[in-house]
């Protein structure tokens, strides 16, 4: 019999799903007492090398309000060629193509190992990939040159049939016509005036796709509308390479003490409108490359006077950010338009100061786009990250998927409360939609314009079965995730994942529910809720909510005697959860101190889309120690791990940091590694560097690489993350110093746990 841990791991590997609880309380009342809701982290396109796509279409339940897909949980009558839907119990006839099925000749979708299965939709046209580059020209020459080279490189990575367009902007916005031989032709727009799709259509002389197709005979293949602004790579490769090479810095003079006039809001608006007119409801990718904040027109986030800095958290709290609300509204409207048409907006912001990611966050968060933040386009961080957008799978297809929709079906005892992740609601009301919303709720379908194999969403459920209506012994609740998307090869695909979990009576079987708790998934699902709240609520309120939930969980599942904190015990399945909450409270997702609004936005954006493993690293970074005492080993994220004769490697997801202890640092400065008799020291110095390189080469987006030492200014990144078990207040209390004291007033994990136990066992709490 597999342990729960093995069961959880197998389910994640097979179906890309992790639940907070793997046995579900059987009534609404008991479920609310569990504190952590029944919820799942789901990775729709989790890579499965053993999952070949099936070349036929799924069989659907015939009930109009259900339409669930045939799956291994359905009961089948092979003789009568009927199947019963496991969600609504409707009996359905198999289609004629299934005439040959029997107990020994089952279709793949009925086999238990295919609880996740992928279908290729045979009907409909295959659409090419569309890329629209939106390029800022208000930047230093070396930055612009590096960006131009990256864009030219990207053309060689695109399939020959992919369509590419180019919009450049500074004080004006230029839409480049790419079909012209031998001449550069572009339409110039004022950067201060917004245009709607209809105005843009008339100005650029675009025809609506429907009108262009109307005169076509029924036998002719569907061709994309002729379009001078988006052309196949194979046709314009040379022209576009030359055009990019000739791009100059924005010619408008910038006087001393002023920022360049940058019309980012209008440029993005034109990009969204252009795709809206030419490729509605088709996957497309707007890639915006930004070297500074928008300083004029709709969407401006700061004025052009350099003496007036861009808004800080302090300004926002004091309601002193005069452009913020208007700019956010502008970008939110663009994000909704793009999402409605299945178009992705990526933002690559490379500048030393803020660029306005806070105001633009909807553009990426609503459309499943990438947000990348670096100091300059001339850094390996940007260049490598941009190249990884075009990563291919073993078949040579891009790993990106476009224009996705995700629908959830549930058995009648459970309803869907909402989703948290890079999606927008499709407002599909139905019998399985809960009235209590968590995240993006009130629907059972969401649009996810951009997906990759790591894109992960959190789904929150509500048990609706009444307390006095017991579920039969051995009953199971089921959930089906149906993801439809445009594969990068142009095919439409449908991936279906169907899972079931046992019900248990929380009064008589509380032990089996407690044993099924997945503390890692629960911590990240609660963290997503907290970060979602932090976008609209005050920081201290969110921390109080998180603390209250943790205390209630300890009271419900801890073992203790009333009023005796020393008696408190947590079972193994819960023991790490308080530690995750401790680190989450200190994380940049909930603490904005020392981070700009743009940095906080960037951190939260990444957290809301990554899978469980990466999310855990973000909440509680991993620390490895290298020393002469043995092979590299994981050590506690604690100040006691910082020893003079150790090298530490810390992975926070956003940074990879190598820290040399005091003694090691002195040896390195003395040059021992260059002496032949100290070759083992040279190997010790090299080991963490090799391990760091491996992480740097595989992660998206590429992390920042920091090499520091005891007393170095960048050691602050490590010191701010470790649990301060030794501080300047208690460093002499133990009689001898072990580890490095941290100069902080933050409470340590031990103090946090003592306080938590005291509150959990108190009758008043």
UniProtKB/Swiss-Prot annotation:
GO-annotated molecular function: GTPase activator activity; zinc ion binding
UniProt xrefs under InterPro entries: ADF-H/Gelsolin-like_dom_sf, Gelsolin-like_dom, Gelsolin-like_dom_sf, Sec23, Sec23/24_helical_dom, Sec23/24_helical_dom_sf, Sec23/24_trunk_dom, Sec23_24_beta_S
Domain notes: The Gelsolin-like repeat mediates interaction with proteins containing PPP motifs.
GO biological processes: cartilage development; COPII-coated vesicle cargo loading; embryonic neurocranium morphogenesis; intracellular protein transport; pectoral fin morphogenesis; protein targeting
Membrane topology: Peripheral membrane protein
GO cellular component: COPII vesicle coat; cytosol; endoplasmic reticulum exit site; endoplasmic reticulum membrane
Function of the molecule: Component of the coat protein complex II (COPII) which promotes the formation of transport vesicles from the endoplasmic reticulum (ER). The coat has two main functions, the physical deformation of the endoplasmic reticulum membrane into vesicles and the selection of cargo molecules for their transport to the Golgi complex.
Subunit annotation: COPII is composed of at least five proteins: the Sec23/24 complex, the Sec13/31 complex and Sar1.
Family stated for the protein in its record: Belongs to the SEC23/SEC24 family. SEC23 subfamily.
Highest taxon of source: Eukaryota
Keywords, ordered alphabetically: Cytoplasm, Cytoplasmic vesicle, Endoplasmic reticulum, ER-Golgi transport, Membrane, Metal-binding, Protein transport, Transport, Zinc
Signal peptide per UniProt: none
Keyword Nucleotide-binding: no
Mapped Gelsolin-like repeat ranges: 632-718
Protein name per its UniProtKB record: Protein transport protein Sec23A
Residues holding Zn(2+): 61, 66, 85, 88
Subcellular localization, as worded in the UniProt entry: Cytoplasmic vesicle, COPII-coated vesicle membrane; Endoplasmic reticulum membrane; Cytoplasm, Cytosol
């Amino acid at each position: 019999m597999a342990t729960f841990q093995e069961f959880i791991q197998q389910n994640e590997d097979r179906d890309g799903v992790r639940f907070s609880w793997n046995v579900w309380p059987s009534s609404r009342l008991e479920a609310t007492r569990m504190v952590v809701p029944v919820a799942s982290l789901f990775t729709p396109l989790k890579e499965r090398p053993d999952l070949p796509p099936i070349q036929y279409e799924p069989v659907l339940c015939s009930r109009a309000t259900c339409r669930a897909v045939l799956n291994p949980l359905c009961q089948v009558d092979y003789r009568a060629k009927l199947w019963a839907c496991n969600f609504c119990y409707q009996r359905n006839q198999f289609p004629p193509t299934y005439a040959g099925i029997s107990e020994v000749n089952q279709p793949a979708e009925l086999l238990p190992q295919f609880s996740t299965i992928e279908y290729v939709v045979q009907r409909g046209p295959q659409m090419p990939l569309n890329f629209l580059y939106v390029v800022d020209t208000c930047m230093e020459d070396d930055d612009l040159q590096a960006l131009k080279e990256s864009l030219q490189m990207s053309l060689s990575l695109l399939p020959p049939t992919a369509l590419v367009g180019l919009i450049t902007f500074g004080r004006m916005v230029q839409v480049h016509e790419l079909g012209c031989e031998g001449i550069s032709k572009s339409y110039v727009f004022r950067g201060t005036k917004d245009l709607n799709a209809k105005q843009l259509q008339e100005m650029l002389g675009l025809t609506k796709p429907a009108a262009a197709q109307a005169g076509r005979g029924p036998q002719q293949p569907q061709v994309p509308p002729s379009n001078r602004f988006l052309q196949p790579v194979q046709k314009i490769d040379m022209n576009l390479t030359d055009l990019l090479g000739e791009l100059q810095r924005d010619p408008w003079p910038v006087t001393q003490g002023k920022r360049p006039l940058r019309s980012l809001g209008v440029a993005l608006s034109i990009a969204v409108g252009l795709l809206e007119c030419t490729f509605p409801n088709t996957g497309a990718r707007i890639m915006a490359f930004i070297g500074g904040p928008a300083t004029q027109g709709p969407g401006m986030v700061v004025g052009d006077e350099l003496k007036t800095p861009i808004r800080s958290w302090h300004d926002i709290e004091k309601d002193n950010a005069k452009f913020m609300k208007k700019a956010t509204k502008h970008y939110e409207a663009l994000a909704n338009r793009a999402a409605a048409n299945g178009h992705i907006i990526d933002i690559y912001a490379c500048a030393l100061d803020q660029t306005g990611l806070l105001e633009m966050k909807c553009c990426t968060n609503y459309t499943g786009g990438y947000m990348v933040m670096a100091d300059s386009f001339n850094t390996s961080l940007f260049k490598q990250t941009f190249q990884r957008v075009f990563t291919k799978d073993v078949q040579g297809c891009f790993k990106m998927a476009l224009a996705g929709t995700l629908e959830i079906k549930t058995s009648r005892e459970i309803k869907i409360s909402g989703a948290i992740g890079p999606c927008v609601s499709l407002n599909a009301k139905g019998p399985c939609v809960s009235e209590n919303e968590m995240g993006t709720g009130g629907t059972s379908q969401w649009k996810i314009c951009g997906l990759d194999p790591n894109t992960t969403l959190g789904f929150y459920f509500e048990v609706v079965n009444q307390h006095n209506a017991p579920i039969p012994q051995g009953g199971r609740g089921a959930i089906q995730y149906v993801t439809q998307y445009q594969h990068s090869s142009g095919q439409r695909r449908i991936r279906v994942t169907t899972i079931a979990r046992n019900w248990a009576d929380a009064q008589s079987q509380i032990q089996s529910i407690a044993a099924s708790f997945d503390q890692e998934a629960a911590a990240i699902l609660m963290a997503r809720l907290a970060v979602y709240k932090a976008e609209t609520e005050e920081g201290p309120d969110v921390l109080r909510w998180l603390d209250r939930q943790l205390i209630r969980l300890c009271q419900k599942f801890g073992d203790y005697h009333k009023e005796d904190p020393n008696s408190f015990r947590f079972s193994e399945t819960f023991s790490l959860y308080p530690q995750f909450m401790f680190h989450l409270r200190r994380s940049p997702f909930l603490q904005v101190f020392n981070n700009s609004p743009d940095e906080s936005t960037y951190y939260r954006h990444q957290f809301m889309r990554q899978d469980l493993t990466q999310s855990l690293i973000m909440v509680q970074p991993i620390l490895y120690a290298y020393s002469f005492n043995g092979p590299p080993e994981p050590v506690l994220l604690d100040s006691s791990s910082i020893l003079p004769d150790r090298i530490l490697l810390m992975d926070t997801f956003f940074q990879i940091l190598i820290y040399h202890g005091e003694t090691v640092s002195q040896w390195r400065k003395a040059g021992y590694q260059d002496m032949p008799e100290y070759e083992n020291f040279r190997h010790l110095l090299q080991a963490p560097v090799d391990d760091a390189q491996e992480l740097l080469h595989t992660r998206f987006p590429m992390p920042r690489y920091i090499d520091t030492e005891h007393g170095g200014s960048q050691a602050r990144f490590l010191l701010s993350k470790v649990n301060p078990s030794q501080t300047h207040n208690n460093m002499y209390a133990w009689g001898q110093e072990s580890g490095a004291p941290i100069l902080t007033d933050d409470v340590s994990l031990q103090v946090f746990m003592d306080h938590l136990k005291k509150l959990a066992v108190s009758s008043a709490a």
